[in-house]
Curated annotation (Swiss-Prot):
The lineage of its organism: Bacteria, Bacillati, Cyanobacteriota, Cyanophyceae, Gloeobacterales. GO terms for cellular component: plasma membrane. The chain crosses the membrane at residues 31-51, 53-73, 98-118, 124-144, 153-173, 181-201, 221-241, 242-262, 285-305. GO terms for biological process: heme biosynthetic process; heme O biosynthetic process. PROSITE patterns: UBIA. It is found in: Cell inner membrane. Pathway: Porphyrin-containing compound metabolism; heme O biosynthesis; heme O from protoheme: step 1/1. This is Protoheme IX farnesyltransferase. Its EC number is 2.5.1.141. The keyword Glycosyltransferase does not apply. It catalyses: heme b + (2E,6E)-farnesyl diphosphate + H2O = Fe(II)-heme o + diphosphate. Pfam families: UbiA. HAMAP family: CyoE_CtaB (MF_00154). It is an enzyme of class 2 (transferase).
Amino acid sequence: MQETLLSRAERSVPRLSAALNDYYQLTKPRIQVLLLITTAGAMWIAGKGHVEPLLLLVTLLGGTLAASSANAFNCLIDRDIDLLMERTRRRAIPAGRILPWQAALFATALGVASFAVLAAFANLFAALLAISGIGFYVVIYTLWLKRTTTQNIVIGGAAGAIPPLVGWAAVTGDLGWSAWVLFGIIFMWTPPHFWALAMMIREDYRKAGVPMLPVVAGDEATARQIFIYTLVLVPVTLVLYPLGTMGWIYLLAAGALGLWLIEGAFRLLKAPNDRKESRSLFKRSIFYLMLLFVAMGIDSIFLFA
């Protein structure tokens, strides 16, 4: 009897681990790193180089819960699309390992937890901004824009630009001009980033009937749009200097990083059908945003010392 119970327990451990991993993957953890970096960067700037460790911790926790909720809802709603795409058909919901009602309950619990954490330990404004981000991503982007227009990621990019607003509001309780510049940076960064990805997996989107720009307009038109958005993005990043929010260290870093990103977008413009170039720009855009916000943090240490 003892051996039977022990063997059952041993068999249940891998199943439990696999189930927990499925729920964890619903939150799309890999794409949350940049959200946390932008949130922390905004808090650091808003606090002029100083943020209470507890406030930083709870805001990042609340932001993680909000992003996890939005991503889980996205997986739930897009389960029909995911089933048709090679990249996503093995996800837990289309594969039947997590039932739709279970995913809905999980996503709702994460959203409620996010609001509770931010409202209790940061402030109500930050909590409401986080909830608005979930709502925008789920209702406006996932339910509406993604399946109806090539501009889905342009307008939907507003959802990904909300985390720095949450971070700023957590520190100050309001939103100044600089907070909206941070919003604008991510808003303008989003199309080049995601269109580069869409160029890499265009056939998957075509099979699923998702009207991403490369599917509808082709790679050449997409590469042109990427280049245009990149050219607009770089000057937006420099606005923080004349506002007095950032100093010369950031200005130099933003300028150098901007030229690096423009060079990558130009290479894609010259070879729009080369998947190596779209993959290169996709990766470059990730490091670009990460290093840009790191530069903000470093600059604020000296600027507000």
